[in-house]
């Protein structure tokens, strides 16, 4: 009921933040939160909530979406239908939280039909969101997009793979990926050459990981070219 206190933004934020913290603490709590109907209330309220409340709601959803066992329930509730419009929110936090939730849901899902259902709608759908985030200058957004795209491409769902391959923006996706690789390599080639002997113990940079993931996407998207069925220019 606290989620419904629309006249008190601070109370709503506090209630949802508490739910998020509870969800993060155990799988049992995640299940209890979903069983209590919290996700359904979030779905009903989030699109019309203040930005601060949207931020908390999408962050909570992203945490819940980490559960392998509970993903089917979240997807069956139609949560993607409200997350997708929020990836284009005026708030960077809401955008990032919504995209993170979609990414978590896309990883090792049992059924990818809910992703096919939102391929091009609402608000440009899954495809529009991926293109928008690949074009972003924010490396966190780029990483979420390329990682999510790999989950979808490797899902084994033929219909979803065909959506990606048959998209009129397939070449645009490919060019965005290739651009990320080229930009990263040109900017870091000299530094990598001069410091190669000293980097073995360092963490992989976000840019390097994006480039590595992008190469994998490029391989998958254009693997048909190896069979002599390259895209028309």
Predicted regions and their residues:
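A positional/structural detector of protein chain ends, strongest at the extreme C-terminus
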Residues: 230-233
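Core helices of alpha-solenoid repeat scaffolds
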Residues: 34-40, 75-81, 118-128, 165-174
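Aromatic- and Gly/Pro-rich donor/ligand-binding loops
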Residues: 4
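Recurring C-terminal helix/loop segment of individual leucine-rich repeat
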Residues: 28-31, 72
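Buried hydrophobic core positions in alpha-solenoid tandem helical repeats
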Residues: 1, 41-43, 82-84, 129-131, ...
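Alpha-helical solenoid repeats of the armadillo/HEAT superfamily
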Residues: 7-24, 35-36, 47-66, 73-77, ...
């Amino acid at each position: 009921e606290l989620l419904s206190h629309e006249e008190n933004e601070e109370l709503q934020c506090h209630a949802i933040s508490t739910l998020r913290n509870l969800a993060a603490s155990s799988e049992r709590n995640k299940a209890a939160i979903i069983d209590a109907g919290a996700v359904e209330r979030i779905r009903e309220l989030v699109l019309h909530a203040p930005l601060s409340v949207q931020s908390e709601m999408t962050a909570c959803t992203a945490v819940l979406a980490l559960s392998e066992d509970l993903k089917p329930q979240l997807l069956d509730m139609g949560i993607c239908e409200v997350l997708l419009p929020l990836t284009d929110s005026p708030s960077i936090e809401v955008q990032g939280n919504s995209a993170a939730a979609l990414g978590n849901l896309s990883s090792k899902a049992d059924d990818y039909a809910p992703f096919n259902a939102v391929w091009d709608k609402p608000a440009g759908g899954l495809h529009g969101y991926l293109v928008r985030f690949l074009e972003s200058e924010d490396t966190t957004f780029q990483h979420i997009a390329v990682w999510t795209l790999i989950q979808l491409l490797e899902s084994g769902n033929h219909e979803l793979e065909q959506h990606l391959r048959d998209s009129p923006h397939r070449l645009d996706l490919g060019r965005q990926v290739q651009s990320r690789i080229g930009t990263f390599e040109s900017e870091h080639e000299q530094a990598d050459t001069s410091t190669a002997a000293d980097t073995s113990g360092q963490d992989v940079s976000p840019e390097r990981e994006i480039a590595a993931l992008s190469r994998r996407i490029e391989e998958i998207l254009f693997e048909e070219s190896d069979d002599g069925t390259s895209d028309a220019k």
